[in-house]
Amino acid sequence: MIGSTVRQQAVSSIVDGKGPVRSDMNGVPADKLFGTNVFGPAEMKAHLPKDVYRSLKRTIERGATLDPAIADVVASAMKDWAVSRGATHYAHVFYPLTGLTAEKHDSFLVPDGEGGALTEFSGKALIQGEPDASSFPSGGIRATFEARGYTAWDVTSPAYILDGNTLCIPTAFVSWTGEALDKKTPLLRSMQALNVQAQRVLKLFGHENPDRIVSYAGAEQEYFLVDRKFYYARPDLLAAGRTLFGAKPPKGQEFEDHYFGAIPERVLAYMVDMEQELFKLGIPVKTRHNEVAPGQFEVAPVFESANIASDHQQLVMLTMRKVAERHGFVCLLHEKPFAGINGSGKHVNFSFGNSTQGNLLEPGDTPHENAQFLVFCSAVIRAVSKFAPLLRASIASASNDHRLGANEAPPAIMSVFLGDQLADVFDQIRAGGAKSSKSRGTLEVGVDTLPKLPKDAGDRNRTSPFAFTGNKFEFRAVGGGQSISGPLIVLNTAIAESLDFIATRLEAAVQSGKPLNAAIQELLAQIIAEHGSVVFNGDGYSADWHAEAEKRGLPNLRTTVDALAALEQPEVIKLFDKYNVLTPRELHSRYEIYLEQYVKAIAVEQKIGTRIAKTMILPAALRYQRELAEGAAAVKNAGLTPDTKALEEVTRQIGELTSGIAALESAGAHEGGSTLDEARHCRDKVLPALEKVRAAA
């Protein structure tokens, strides 16, 4: 069999190959390496005049409008710094609706007219670029002949040097008509909306002119590493990102021995190399470890501003793939590359606050007495409850559908885990008023030489899609290969709407003469009474929870096609329009784009699945059938009665495979109708046909 030969060659090559590539920090301490390729605050201060630096810093920290007069000075300083570090080109980096990174490189070099050249970078080139807007997904916003689009410098996300020769400038990407064609623009708008509404609430608590409120994020990235020789032997992995065929291995993850196990030397060398590259880019990766499935690992950073965290997450995925090639690996970010073992998610840790008031989701030791925390926490609960379908839509994709709802990832039902302490506090509020908080206490292990451990007031719940974990919420349903900007846009905007609701109610109550504390207690009780059904502290994997969620009226949107319908709901359209995050046209364009991406992803799987089944699996099965038939004939010619059970079973299976291939080809030939019709056909016809072929193979 061809497949077996290729596999044997791959195994032999790996076994006979060199040992793991060793990597170190080249003798440079991590803190000295950190940010060396970033034009961050220290470099700005060193290269810019004081007044220009102060003006730029004010824009970055306070959200003030950028002064166009300083653009040329900043551009020149940025160019000089980049050239001194070996850069020859610059690029406006943006994040189109493909979910990937886009960039076009332009040289600093300009002919001087006398046979020589000089380097040049103007303020205009820094602030604005003009890529072709018709060649990216636009969902109808741009026609093929309407090509003009603009990139605009995002001053809040620092420029950096990538691969030693290109100055990369993070930018927003909009059409000639000003409509957002990317993931950064609505994220920045949503952060602005959250800030405005959070400021209103803080002022009610006596904070006059509080600093800008920023949402923070940190994404725990799971991934698989596969030797490149195995990867290129699998056309399905190459084209679809996941294996469409394959038997369950004799040993998978059932021994639970891979999670947090000793990191293999070759993998550790890769991790160290990857971290070194990320440190240079100013990305504060913190943890690394084995994940649950064989060949699966995780890297996680420290919290950053949501905008920078989103940019950095794109860089993390790019760097992971690049560095993997150096070590003979391929890095897989698909949510479910292998059936039968865990897939890869990206837990997004989320909070918001500022340097003055701190983390607004910090409960303190006595959360029942922390009215400010309870108000902001209740805003999050209300947001998840009211816009659960939208939150589910924000992480919808063909690949993530394979992961959600299995006993490895949270279900598609959006619920909130609060933990014992907070659940008890909110139960008290609903009953008439919170009087106490469960204490944290200490844990004695029973060994004299081991210290007493501070014990948290509640357990963790890994089955919850949206869990409170001490001073932040963790959104666990995000897929391993997805941009985190989509979920962050939804969280920022939905929470802004809840804070708007709360601020409006409290402002009116105070103006009418009601004491603030009494108004808060009354409003919190109302919010929990109306939205407490979204709180669930139990086992999200259990069938009982699915039945209970249905009783509570919580939506269970199992597929992307079901989930994306939320983007067309009037209340969602109104939400994004009211807070100037997405216009109705911009929102509808995303609905069309995400449906189209779903259709295209499954179409690729259908095509490569059909090809593999017809050209690799079926021929091998027919050869095996012939060998069995020839063996039976030889036994019969010897005057004996052959046992044909194996031949009959293989013949039956070949029949199932042949009919399955025909059904898969027929399903793939479907054309016509709207994008929604095509998506439904892919869900209802193509995917079942593909699974049938896999089972037969």
Name the predicted role of every residue range.
Residues P29-G40, T59-E61, G178, P250-Y259:
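Gly-rich Lys/Arg/Thr-decorated short loops/hinges at beta-loop-alpha junctions or inter-strand turns
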Residues L33-E146:
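Active-site core of metal-dependent hydrolases
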Residues I60, D112, F279, R321, ...:
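Anion (oxyanion) recognition and catalysis
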Residues G99-G115, S134, G139, R234-D236, ...:
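Short linear, low-complexity motifs centered on an aromatic residue
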Residues A147-L333, F338-Y594:
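Glycine-rich, acidic/polar active-site loops that bind/position phosphate-bearing ligands
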Residues I527-A697:
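C-terminal amphipathic alpha-helical interaction region
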